[in-house]
Amino acid sequence: MPKVKLNHLLIAAIFFAATLSPLQLLADTVLPQYSDDVHLGVTSCAGSTCHGATSPWKGSTVLQNEYITWDRYDPHSKAYSVLLNDVSKQMAKNLGIGKAHEAKICLDCHADNVAEKNRGRVFQISDGVGCEACHGGGERWLGLHVSGVASHQDNLDAGLYPTEDPVKRAELCLSCHFGDDKKIVTHRIMGAGHPRLDFELDTFTATQPAHYEIDKDYYERKIVSNGMQTWAIGQALALEKRFEALLKMGETGGIFPELVLFDCQACHHSLMTQKWQPRPGTGLGPGVVRFDDSNLLMLQIILESIDAARGKALQRKTVELHKATTTNSKEFYRVAQSLRDEAKELVPMFSNYKFGKKDVENLLRKLIKRTKEAEFFDYVGAEQAIMGITSVLA
């Protein structure tokens, strides 16, 4: 190829890369559990001069006591040991899967359950959800990381997972706190005794014991999103994953679809008191198994706050979805696919949108209005609304 043409191609490639958002540049990032990198084990991070200091170091760009925080205060460090208690033993017995702490279906989310070939010399499955379960196998990036001369971008290029990016963090967290195309907590697993899964990205990020500090140095090296943006991205991705699961699992071979994707309270409620009341946003009467639309509700409100016409359109499509559950399964899956596609479009939209004070005010007004209209009478809707208010006011 002539040199002048090659130079033009290089310039074009550089220009194209410069126009991409961080989200687009990280688009091909593989979740830590599914990458080919070797996971070296928690102890590779736990040295007293690495991340195992008993207290934060003064003058360091990081706290240095991250391992201690995780080990003592973070529930992720106890995720494996939960599989050894009597409740988990009974669940495993109910499911007929052998021992819970040996079953892949349990280990996939209660531990850093990478393939045997990707486990280093001191790796221990009993460490639970450890460092590399979230930050990625350290085979390629750990040496750079401890060298003191590599940039954060160098580490990312070598396989460090970008947890600071809200989109990638949502994909990571949701892979266990909801599920992905390889693992999911089904209604059968819940029937065996597993608790209901709930999740909201910004709230769960804030309530996890922080082993980092968002200071000047952090801002210089990493992506920082505000609470409302993180919340909005989390809602869109959670809905996308729910519809992807619905479309993949479809009708499970029996007469029912996968019920874990529907609202638990539609069936699991007291029969001693009459609590049902109509919800305007569903168009449904009593006795119907409702699709869990809690993320849809939040997205309607977010969109109404920044793009009123699109928000109203989403509201109408939500009613279409609910009505189709009682009339036509083909129509139900058609609307579900359309809503899945829309949720996917909203992720980059929210990533690039600059949420400001006026957006927060509009959103709070919309939330209050929907509350008065009894849209949050369902537990899951009220739960997401409360976490949303906390996120946008933080």
Language-model features: where?
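Primarily the internal scaffold of c-type cytochrome electron-transfer domains
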Residues: 28-33, 54-93, 122-129, 137-390
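Short N-terminal segments immediately surrounding and downstream of signal-peptide cleavage
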Residues: 27-48
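Bacterial N-terminal signal peptides
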Residues: 11-22
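N-terminal secretory signal peptides that target proteins for export/translocation
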Residues: 1-7
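Cys/His/Pro-rich metal-binding microdomains
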Residues: 43-51, 107, 132, 174, ...
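Aromatic-flanked redox-active Cys/Sec active sites in thiol-based oxidoreductases
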Residues: 42, 47, 111, 128, ...
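Post-signal peptide N-terminal segment of secreted/secretory-pathway proteins
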Residues: 92-132
